[in-house]
């Protein structure tokens, strides 16, 4: 029996190029004892804490595999609760970045979280429609509240009462009594999803945001308080209501459930609406910690800021209004007006301050009000930017001023092409708006150059220049020392889909959507602005084809050129004469990527039909077809000096294969969305990949050998554990699903723990039987048994 081939394991080395994931939220945290100086944002599975003043990353809260979805800082500012895509919640210390507590209860992504006033309890809502209350101090789940029919969008503790209010995509707002753990009131006045909620005016009012441009305002009156204080002035009870609002209230009250038995805790009635300027749905609606400022935004780039008057300010305004009304009455020499007619409108109590216009679509925000009356707002934008604004509320006309912007460490759009320099040190990444050069060891961005929509790229031999092919058919040549664009050439009439450097390094070849393959040579031309000559490129030959060209590759000896066409075939031509040599057909959809091995014997093709085919370059025969990914194969590249190759797929996975044994070696999992491209370093030690999740990931080859049988066994175990965790709870005859339940969920750990308990009970029973037998024997022998 021969020795099995030894493979080396690739492991994740770093995540970079990402400032904040648009799928998570932003939360202001304290840095160096200063509140509002730091901002925590979800970054794929990790959480990054940025110093807004310096624009630096100061802390990474490392996650496991699942994407971070929701962040909630504790009231003391020392901890951060992070909810993940799989429903788990981890509580991190902001002092050392360690995860102290893990809660497992939800079956789907966490969508909302909030601490109570003291930070002892945490409530979480999820896409699985459940709400769970957790005991942070005892590190355990208290109970699960069931009632929503769709994802929970917001959860709020009431500070004074032991009550909870939750909203969901099922259009319902539910009130829960946490003493009895049941829902005692359901607001059904909304016709669309309730996307956000906020409690204002010392928890006497509730504001809800839905799919339209109205923010609905509801008055909360606690029944016990009304019984205690029957002499409450009428003006206080009816403040802010208007004839229009009263009509709305009547309409909405008819929609409310008949809950007369449960009206003993509180009443909730609609008093009117605040109109937003945005026409689309509310994405985030929140107040600052003091409850004085309300802000909301939709799916656009505008944050609307409102000021909420306190009880004292409302009273003062009401008195002023009464005085004015009396003066008017005297002037008209009429009888005195009754005071009850004077009341404040809702717009006077909740006043629009200003709008903050961000540079791109807002995905999340957080804000903090300083004692001096200055509002600090931080925005997480869709295009991988974090912006902070300052708003002086004491000014006559408050205007938002941008205080800081964190953007240099990432691209604004998806990276579509990557390349390694010949010395394995520099990494090129290019997107729709810029080309960035990164230092591989420090992961710092050392150059940023504006470009058009980039599709392909490479380092020019010598690593002093780079060439980028664009969607508009241009070739752009950049000088790295100066970071400037040296030359732009209109190369193709359509997109430049592929570019390949010739093995002799004297030129390169491009393939485009204009059905042409063009051959280029490097040349030195005189520069008018300099004495020295500069690098340029000239077209030397052209190969016209019948279909769009998607990918081009040279064989290592430069004798053959492989061209992938839109008709799902790969044509092989002789480079010198451009005569046709072979046609590789068999893919059902176009070949998006391909590569030729270092010895020129094999060509591997990856297609949109999810398959990878390995062909011999001598006769064009297909050695093997491999089902590689669950979606299109986007990129394929051989490891230097070997027949091993990597593929990247739209399913978010990167896989390594053996082209001789036709075996899958390992899967590099980390990206949460489609992987667009990857690049291997010339020495094969590093892999860099780019994804739709805006992250760039670096993978490193270790010296650790990888045994295929062990890998398969580990994969089977992981699949089994996942299937066990997904199994539903057993249905017991005659038992109905209650409104509350246990907070935990079945995982492989809980199953193992239950089995250990069962084993211990079994052992105890066996030992008790033995003890009884021993006692009986001793009794028969007349011996005394101690204990």
Where are these regions (language model features)?
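Terminal intrinsically disordered, low-complexity extensions flanking WD-repeat/beta-propeller proteins
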Residues: 2-6, 15, 193, 213-293, ...
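A structural motif specific to WD40 beta-propellers
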Residues: 13, 58-59, 98-101, 140-143, ...
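Loop/turn segments within WD40 beta-propeller blades
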Residues: 28-36, 71-77, 113-120, 155-162, ...
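Conserved strand-to-loop turn within each blade of WD40 beta-propeller repeats
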Residues: 42-43, 83-86, 125-128, 166-170, ...
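WD40-repeat beta-propellers
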Residues: 47-51, 89-92, 131-135, 173-176, ...
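Ankyrin-repeat and related helical/solenoid repeat scaffolds used for protein-protein interactions
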Residues: 174-201, 628, 632-694
């Amino acid at each position: 029996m021969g020795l099995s081939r030894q493979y080396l394991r690739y492991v994740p080395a770093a995540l970079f190029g990402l400032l904040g994931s648009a799928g998570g939220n932003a939360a202001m945290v304290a840095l160096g004892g200063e509140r509002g100086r730091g901002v925590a944002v979800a970054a794929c599975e990790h959480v990054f804490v940025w110093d807004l003043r310096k624009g630096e990353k100061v802390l990474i809260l490392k996650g496991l595999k699942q994407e971070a979805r929701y962040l909630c800082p504790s009231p003391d500012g020392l901890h951060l609760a992070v909810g993940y895509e799989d429903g788990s919640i981890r509580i991190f210390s902001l002092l050392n970045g360690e995860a102290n507590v893990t809660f497992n209860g939800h079956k789907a992504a966490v969508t909302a979280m909030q601490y109570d006033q003291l930070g002892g309890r945490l409530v979480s809502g999820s896409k699985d429609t459940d709400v769970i209350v957790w005991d942070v101090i005892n590190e355990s789940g208290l109970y699960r509240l069931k009632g929503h029919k769709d994802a929970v969008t917001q959860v709020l503790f009431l500070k004074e009462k032991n009550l909870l209010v939750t909203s969901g995509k099922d259009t319902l707002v539910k009130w829960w009594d946490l003493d009895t753990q049941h829902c005692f009131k359901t607001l059904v006045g909304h016709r669309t999803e309730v996307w956000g909620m906020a409690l204002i005016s010392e928890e006497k009012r509730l504001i809800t945001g839905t799919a339209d441009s109205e923010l609905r305002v509801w008055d909360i009156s606690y029944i016990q308080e009304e019984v205690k204080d029957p002499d409450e002035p009428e003006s206080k009870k009816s403040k802010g209501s208007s004839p229009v609002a009263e009509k709305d209230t009547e309409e909405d009250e008819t929609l409310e459930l008949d809950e007369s038995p449960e009206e003993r805790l509180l009443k909730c009635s609609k008093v009117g609406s605040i109109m937003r300027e945005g026409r689309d749905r509310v994405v985030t609606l929140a107040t600052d910690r003091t409850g004085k400022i309300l802000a909301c935004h939709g799916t656009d780039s505008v944050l609307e800021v409102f000021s909420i008057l306190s009880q004292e300010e409302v009273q003062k305004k009401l008195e002023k209004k009464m005085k004015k009304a009396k003066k008017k009455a005297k002037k008209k020499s009429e009888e005195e007006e009754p005071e009850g007619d004077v009341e404040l409108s809702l717009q006077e109590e909740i006043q629009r301050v200003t709008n903050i216009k961000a540079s791109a679509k807002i995905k999340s925000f957080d804000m903090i009000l300083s004692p001096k009356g200055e509002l600090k707002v931080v925005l997480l934008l869709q295009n991988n930017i974090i912006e902070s604004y300052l708003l002086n509320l004491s000014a006559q006309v408050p205007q938002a001023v941008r205080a800081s912007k964190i953007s240099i460490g990432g691209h604004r759009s998806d990276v579509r092409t990557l390349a390694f320099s010949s010395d394995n040190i520099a990494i090129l990444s290019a997107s729709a708006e810029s080309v960035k050069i990164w230092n591989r060891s420090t992961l710092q961005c050392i150059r940023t150059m504006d470009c058009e929509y980039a599709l392909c790229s490479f380092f020019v031999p010598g690593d002093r220049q780079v060439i980028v092919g664009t969607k508009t058919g241009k070739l752009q040549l950049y000088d790295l020392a100066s970071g400037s664009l040296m030359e732009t050439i209109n190369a193709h009439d359509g997109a430049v889909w592929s570019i390949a450097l010739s093995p002799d390094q004297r030129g390169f070849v491009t393939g485009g959507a204009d059905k042409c393959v063009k051959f280029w040579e490097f040349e030195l031309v005189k520069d008018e602005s300099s004495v020295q000559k500069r690098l340029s490129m000239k077209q030397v030959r052209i190969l016209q084809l019948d279909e769009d060209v998607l990918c081009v590759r040279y064989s290592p000896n430069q004798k053959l050129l492989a061209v992938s066409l839109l008709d799902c075939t790969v044509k092989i031509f002789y480079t010198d004469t451009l005569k046709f040599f072979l046609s590789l057909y068999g893919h059902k959809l176009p070949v998006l990527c391909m590569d030729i091995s270092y010895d020129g014997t094999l060509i591997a093709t990856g297609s949109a039909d999810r398959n990878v085919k390995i062909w011999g370059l001598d006769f064009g025969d297909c050695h093997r077809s491999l089902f590689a990914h669950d979606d299109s194969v986007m990129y394929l590249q051989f490891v230097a000096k070997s027949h091993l190759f990597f593929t990247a797929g739209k399913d978010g996975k990167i896989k390594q294969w053996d082209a001789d044994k036709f075996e899958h070696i390992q899967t590099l999992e980390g990206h949460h969305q489609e992987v667009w491209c990857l690049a291997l370093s010339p020495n094969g030690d590093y892999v860099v990949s780019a994804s739709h999740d805006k992250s760039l990931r670096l993978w490193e080859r270790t010296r650790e050998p990888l045994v295929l049988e062990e890998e398969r066994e580990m994969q089977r175990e992981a699949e089994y554990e996942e299937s066990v965790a997904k199994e539903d709870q057993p249905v017991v005859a005659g038992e109905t699903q209650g409104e509350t339940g246990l907070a935990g969920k079945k995982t492989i750990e809980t199953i193992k723990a239950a089995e250990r308990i069962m084993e211990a009970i079994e052992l105890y029973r066996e030992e008790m039987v033995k003890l009884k037998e021993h006692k009986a024997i001793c009794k028969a022998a007349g011996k005394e048994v101690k204990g």
